[in-house]
Swiss-Prot record:
Involved in biosynthesis of the epicuticular wax. Plays a role in very-long-chain fatty acid (VLCFA) biosynthesis and is required for VLCFA elongation in leaf. Despite its classification as a BAHD acyltransferase based on sequence homology, CER26L does not seem to share the catalytic mechanism of the members of the BAHD family. GO terms for cellular component: chloroplast thylakoid membrane. This is Protein ECERIFERUM 26-like. Pfam families: Transferase (PF02458). Keywords: Cell wall biogenesis/degradation. Belongs to the plant acyltransferase family. InterPro entries: CAT-like_dom_sf, Plant_Fungal_Acyltransferase. One of its GO terms (biological process) is cell wall organization. Coiled coil: none annotated.
Amino acid sequence: MGLVQEEGSGPVHGFRLSTVSASLPSETGTTHEPTGLDLAMKLHYLKAVYIYSAGTARDLTVMDVKAPLFSVFYQIPCIIGRFRRHESGRPYLKCNDCGTRFVESHCDLTVEEWLRVPDRSVDESLVYHQPVGPDLAFSPLLYIQMTRFSCGGLALGLSWAHIMGDPFSLSHFFNLWAQAFAGGKIYCPKTSVTERDFQNPTSTFKKPDSVKQVDLVGDLWVAPNNSKMTTFSFNLTVNDLKTHFPVNGDGEFEILTGIIWKCVATVRGESAPVTITVIRSDPKKLKPRAVRNGQMISSIHVDFSVAEASLEEIVKSIGEAKDERVVIDEIVDDVSDFIVYGANLTFVDMSEVDFYEAKVMGKSPESVYCNVQGIGDDGAVVVLPGVVEEERVVTVTLPVDEIEKVKWEMKKCGLITPLV
């Protein structure tokens, strides 16, 4: 019997919690040891929402959604594990321990009405989220929320502890669910630490600029903030971006990063960021896919005024990013706590994540949203693929007292329209 929980007075309500486990138990004593790079992500979470039309999902029952999870969890038992600590204090994962939480809810709107809102950050209300802790042995690493719209459409929202894996891992997990739902055979290989061959590691030891050590948080894994953060999102097309901001030889992500960095720098004035972090896919793209933290984490430092520099100069500096994963992996010890997202102004390229491969009844989602929970005070920008190949969804998380000023700078330069 699930737990019934009514929360809030908005259009999403009627929360009912239950547990989903693997189809078979794992071998007794199966554990997973997180790497230093995993532990650097300990205070961050990914929140993803897949929305399917009524025509696709009207006849899907709760059991239809739950059943494929049994085999996926058996293939990836760490996802439904629970953390413990070694005597040294270093966390480790006891695999296939207690399952995950499945949340059922209802929305009073239709899918069409829900998607009519231009700011897709509203989708975060379709994700049931709880941080890991304070009781590590009882804290799930994954929550799955199934929301039924009034028209019969369906949203599946995931709250994913980033210590388990990067956005590609989350997408891989959900694509496996879709394959199992369609009756296909699934297989997820295990990835050993020795298989992590990071490209262009830093040749000499230097404290990485892309991470920031924070005060110890104990067993409640929540990133500390001095500022109240807020989020908004907007859509654009690659063609419009390159037409209005022509920069020779550079991709849309670099151009977007340069524009938004310049806007934030203008707003922050004397405290304008001269160091940023860029997180994107590993150029080597480990295959076959596995659940891991393999995303490339780089820092860029400039010695000029970003607010006054040309877009070409800023974009050129982004091409000189230094991959810091090896050093991050080395410096993160057993007990210290760090943040990555928002340690500096952080730009995350998820445009290559294959979110729209998660087909139900042969149909791709109507919309997919993904963002990071636990962003530090310097803020973060996430670039997502749109439902149309040439479209991008840009999600911006900044301190409350900056967000409207940054929006205004984006309007002035022509990145967003006055309607946003």
